[in-house]
């Protein structure tokens, strides 16, 4: 029951996490800087909490790749939900099972099989339906935010496959690698942005407090979700985590006035179905 509660909590928070980042942007703090600070807070807490374990834990290049891929995943996701329509971005992110099937085949040697093929077909059909434009042209993401959401899902899938490959590392070690990776990727990406650093007037106590709070939430959320995944069957976990889309749809409607059209609902349903079938690809959740 505790594991299920953890996953439901994780789904709810991930479905709402876009909102404080939008609030921060409206206060004058861009997505790159806000992501940097919030994940730096999570990293700082993690280094203190797991310092003793980290000092004796084995190192490997795989942790570096996990850091890089997870770093882009989280930065791209934040930028996407700030700039774009929340549900369209999240559904493009939820094409991750499609990429997971392909990466697992390439990196882990897993057979695609009938279920894997069904996941691929449903994902592609859902994306094509949602992105179709009557005016013509290829069904591709319409703007930078949607491309960011798509790339975040792709990197999320790759980081998960890499995490499965790095099974000798603890949850704490992989979590710290993720927080470190996000911090570094934000610094590199932000270095090329003229407006990366907000003005001093934007960094009011309330703004700093909100960023610190989000950082604490990200730290706790990572551990809660990892615990839930470790103690819940894959089929059940994927269904619970899909509640994120429900929470996000409700929040986007009431907090941002965003609503999906019939074609987007149809495409989204196929993407959700692909995610549900993806839970049958493995008996044990990654991580």
Q: What residue ranges belong to the model's regions?
A:
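Specific transmembrane alpha-helical segments of multi-pass solute transporters/efflux pumps
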Residues: 13-16, 53-88, 129, 216-232
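C-terminal-most transmembrane helix of multi-pass membrane proteins
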Residues: 132, 238, 242-287
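Hydrophobic alpha-helical transmembrane segments of multi-pass integral membrane proteins
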Residues: 1-6, 31-48, 119-122, 147, ...
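Transmembrane alpha-helical segments that form core, pore/gating elements
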Residues: 7, 11-23, 46, 100-101, ...
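C-terminal transmembrane-helix exit sites in multi-pass transporters
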Residues: 50, 96-121, 246-265
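Juxtamembrane helix-loop boundary signature in multi-pass membrane transporters
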Residues: 1-9, 101-154, 164, 269-287
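Helix-helix packing/entry segments at the starts of transmembrane helices
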Residues: 90-95, 163-182, 218-254
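Specific alpha-helical transmembrane segments that line the substrate/conduction pathway
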Residues: 33-36, 40, 78-108, 234-253
């Amino acid at each position: 029951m505790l594991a299920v509660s953890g996953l439901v909590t994780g789904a709810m928070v991930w479905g709402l996490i876009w909102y404080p980042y939008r609030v921060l942007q409206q206060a004058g703090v861009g997505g790159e800087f806000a992501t940097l600070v919030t994940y730096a807070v999570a990293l700082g807490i993690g280094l203190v909490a797991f310092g003793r374990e980290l000092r004796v834990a084995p190192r490997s290049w795989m942790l570096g790749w996990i850091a890089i891929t997870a770093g882009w995943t989280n930065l791209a996701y934040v930028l996407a939900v700030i700039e774009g329509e929340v549900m369209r971005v999240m559904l493009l992110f939820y094409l991750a099972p499609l990429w997971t099937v392909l990466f697992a085949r390439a990196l882990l040697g897993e057979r695609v099989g009938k279920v894997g093929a069904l996941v691929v077909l449903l994902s592609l059909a859902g994306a094509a339906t949602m992105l179709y434009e009557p005016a013509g042209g290829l069904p591709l993401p319409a703007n930078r935010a949607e491309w960011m959401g798509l790339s975040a899902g792709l990197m999320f899938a790759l980081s998960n496959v890499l995490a499965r490959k790095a099974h000798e590392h603890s949850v704490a070690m992989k979590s710290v690698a993720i927080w470190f990776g996000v911090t570094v990727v934000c610094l590199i990406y932000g270095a090329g942005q003229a407006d990366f650093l907000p003005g001093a007037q934007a960094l009011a106590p309330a703004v700093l407090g909100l960023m610190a709070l989000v950082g604490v939430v990200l730290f706790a959320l990572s551990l809660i979700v990892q615990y839930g995944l470790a103690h819940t069957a894959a089929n059940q976990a994927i269904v619970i985590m899909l509640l994120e889309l429900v929470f996000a749809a409700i929040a986007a409607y009431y907090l941002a006035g965003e609503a999906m059209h019939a074609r987007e609902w149809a495409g989204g349903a196929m993407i959700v179905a692909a995610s549900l079938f993806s839970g049958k690809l493995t008996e044990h959740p990654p991580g």
